[in-house]
């Protein structure tokens, strides 16, 4: 009788324990489901010692998920894994799937693979978890192997998983063959074909590969298109410079009674500048944003300001700026960049001072725009002010700003300041070296430019097209013909293609210093068609050195064919004929100009008397 009572007590105790474990498990699942991960972990730590083996196994998936999403220290995740092994719960497929997801969150790809490989039984979730981990780590070909294995064992992936693979394929810049393989997976599964998410991912992928035909085919086949689908098409077309199509799609989207969102508007705006519609298209999109209540968005307002400036309507951009309730550093940067593009350095400095008064600190983007304005204005007084502001804001370690300062000082006439900035840079990239070479070249210091060029190569930097052009320009300014010839003939050593701009600079150098025959030979042997600039510089060299022979006539003929509507070419040709005594030919050139209604462009000068900028054209009269 006593043994019967004892048995009943054991059964009751186990039933009570099982009920408590069930209640705890349900409570933990509820907390994790509602994303209260911190509370779930606290409850687990409080109750862990009262749990039996069965109860522990039941709550493990919830606790592991909470650990992963709460981003607890990795040590807790490792402890949970050890407890799984100790309790024999690692044989449970659900627990193993949770461990894979947790290790993926902690970016422990080797642990992910180990758990997956040691699983006795795998399901769809197992494969989805490890493939998502591969997508997260950029392991495209590993993911492809797993997706093949998944199909081999009869597991069908969800559309979200294939969408992740497509996004990875796009990000990794894979071949179109791989892209079409994933597309084939979609075509063989009707459920996937109905997925808007998956179709949108396909559209985005094909547009990133610049395959418009395939993208439009997928887009047209979609039975349901949402805002994201249309936005993917619009942004892809604009990114691939198919601006007209991007704008047409934007209008078609509205005809389908779909409301473009903030991302759609930001995607279509760059097309406005490229299509040369002026500010009319920007106004159309701006009006749409007002009608649908998007106009208050700060990032969108900043984008509208930038586009108005690029379309030449700075005044309207300023109205937007002044009427904005909240003006953050992005808006200030947009407004300053707008004035910088128009070359209004005075207004740029006024805005900078106003910005400081309102207590807003300039960031690197703002300062780069200001440096750009000063570079274009070539005003040294403003350049020094900007440099002080950069020092004050603590951005001198910013390599982009340092490079911009070198260029700014060089163009503003202070080589010593450019040199000082260059040697104070804690880190120098290829642009830094190229900027300094260019600075020496602008001031006619060819030997110093060559020393910097040699130092750049000795420092392990590869010569790119920008550095190559900088050293050729420096030799051109300093008259170092032999050195330039040596460098140009060694272009193949730098594993860099010689561009049209490089040829133009080199031919100009040869022509300026009387090597007309060499210049002409280089021109006719170029691997690409010579530009009008090359023919023009050659013709000027012929005039300077009195070489109006057969070569001079050929060059003049090529120049006229290359740029028949450029009045400067006719003026140069008329001048050459006059100086050679061929007045009849000079008069004929002037008559052709009159018939074509081509007028000579006036020269333009800018001076800075007493810190006031004054502009003069060739036909203007100056009191100075």
UniProtKB/Swiss-Prot annotation:
* Entry keyword annotation includes Metal-binding: no
**Matching PANTHER family, A to Z?**
PENTACOTRIPEPTIDE-REPEAT REGION OF PRORP DOMAIN-CONTAINING PROTEIN, PENTATRICOPEPTIDE REPEAT-CONTAINING PROTEIN
Keywords from the named record: Mitochondrion, Repeat, Transit peptide
Question: Where is the signal peptide, in residue numbers?
Answer: none
What stretches of residues are PPR repeats?
A: 56-91, 92-122, 123-157, 158-192, 195-225, 226-260, 261-296, 297-327, 328-362, 363-397, 398-428, 429-463, 464-498, 499-529
Name-wise, this protein is: Pentatricopeptide repeat-containing protein At4g31070, mitochondrial
**Major subcellular site:** mitochondrion
Q: Which PROSITE patterns match?
A: PPR
Q: Which domain of life is it from?
A: Eukaryota
Transit peptide segment: 1-15
Cellular location of this protein?
Answer: Mitochondrion
Instruction: Name the GO terms of the biological process aspect.
Output: RNA modification
